[in-house]
Amino acid sequence: MELKERLQALKSEAVDKVSQITDKKALQDIKVSYIGKKGVITGLMKEMKSLPNEEKPMFGQLVNDAKQTVESAIAEVEARIEAELVNKRLQSETIDITLPGKKLSPGSSHPLDRIVEDIEDLFIGLGYEIVEGFEVESDHYNFEALNLPKSHPARDMQDSFYISEEVLMRTHTSPVQARTLESRNGEGPVKIICPGKVYRRDSDDATHSHQFTQIEGLVVDENIKMSDLKGTLEYFAKKMFGEDREIRLRPSFFPFTEPSVEVDISCFKCKGKGCNVCKGTGWIEILGAGMVHPNVLEMAGFDSNKYSGFAFGMGPDRIAMLKYGIEDIRHFYTNDLRFIRQFLRLEDGGEPNVSK
């Protein structure tokens, strides 16, 4: 059989086989065996040496045409196979749009997160900066830099979770204040709030938890006075608990402030007449505060003759309990969705239907 006849026969044979293929692997095998580098049609090029010189160019063209014909047939079948695969996949993934959909349950902010965000927004509006710090803290920043020497009762091992002799879980967010002051190289102003989790060796009950949330504030600048602290706390109380709230400052003691005060607000339930919320006093304690102790400023590199400041600390847990009428702090940390979902109404500006 002449080369031209063999070429024609191989081309017809390849096209016929390709037309019967139904999967990609078999199609690839046909392609390799006929028009691959070692394919039978490609191999005819090597036999051109037996042809007269004047016929070689024409035969070479015929071989290329045959390869293109087979490639076109392969491409056509490949497209058909791909389309069939797509159709099968679509059929298997068919969605019955008449079936009822799955209800998406709306989520809500955790009540503690919401209170923290509200407090942050309030103080951001006053020009405060939010600063966060380490939950695992050094003894120096947790105590000594805050005017609590080694001999102070608050340093008792029974009151704190110590990891080593010089490392513990922070007992308040005040170390953030100490670190921030130190980082300012003795230059004011400083105006920050420090939210975060804190840890103490308390027995868990309705009003105590070994882990709780705290937010502390610090302002340091020239000529900061007690009246600045009082004005700030009055603003906070009115924005958080209602414009008709009044505050009362009672003398207290904190190692890192002097003078120190406990801050009460007039009861929002009985309007000062006395009830179960305020325990008959007409007042509710919400936070502690005071003027920054000169020792704290000096240890951080500030000139206490030039700079003064005030600090305050509050527990969002307690504020949330007061604001929403929650009687057990443990509800915040049990991850009970029945409790959390009661706060969905807050997302729409309503009040929660809280089960105490």
From Swiss-Prot:
One cellular component term from this protein's GO annotations in UniProt:
cytoplasm
Q: Does the keyword rRNA-binding apply?
A: no
- Where does the record place it? Cytoplasm
Q: Which SUPFAM superfamilies does the record associate with it?
A: Class II aaRS and biotin synthetases, tRNA-binding arm
- EC number, UniProt record: 6.1.1.20
Q: Which UniProt keywords apply?
A: Aminoacyl-tRNA synthetase, ATP-binding, Cytoplasm, Ligase, Magnesium, Metal-binding, Nucleotide-binding, Protein biosynthesis
Give the source's domain of life in one word.
Bacteria
Q: Which Pfam families match?
A: Phe_tRNA-synt_N (PF02912), tRNA-synt_2d (PF01409)
Chief location: cytoplasm
Catalytic activity as recorded in UniProt = tRNA(Phe) + L-phenylalanine + ATP = L-phenylalanyl-tRNA(Phe) + AMP + diphosphate + H(+)
Binding, Mg(2+): E258
**MF terms per GO, please?**
ATP binding; catalytic activity, acting on a protein; magnesium ion binding; phenylalanine-tRNA ligase activity; transferase activity; tRNA binding
Cofactor list: Mg(2+)
Instruction: Please give the biological process terms from Gene Ontology that the record holds.
Output: phenylalanyl-tRNA aminoacylation
User: Does Transmembrane show up as a keyword for this record?
Assistant: no
Textual note on the cofactor: Binds 2 magnesium ions per tetramer.
Recorded family membership: Belongs to the class-II aminoacyl-tRNA synthetase family. Phe-tRNA synthetase alpha subunit type 1 subfamily.
PANTHER family with a match to the protein in the record:
PHENYLALANINE--TRNA LIGASE, MITOCHONDRIAL, PHENYLALANYL-TRNA SYNTHETASE
Assembly notes: Tetramer of two alpha and two beta subunits.
What protein is this chain from?
Answer: Phenylalanine--tRNA ligase alpha subunit
The record lists the organism as Macrococcus caseolyticus (strain JCSC5402)
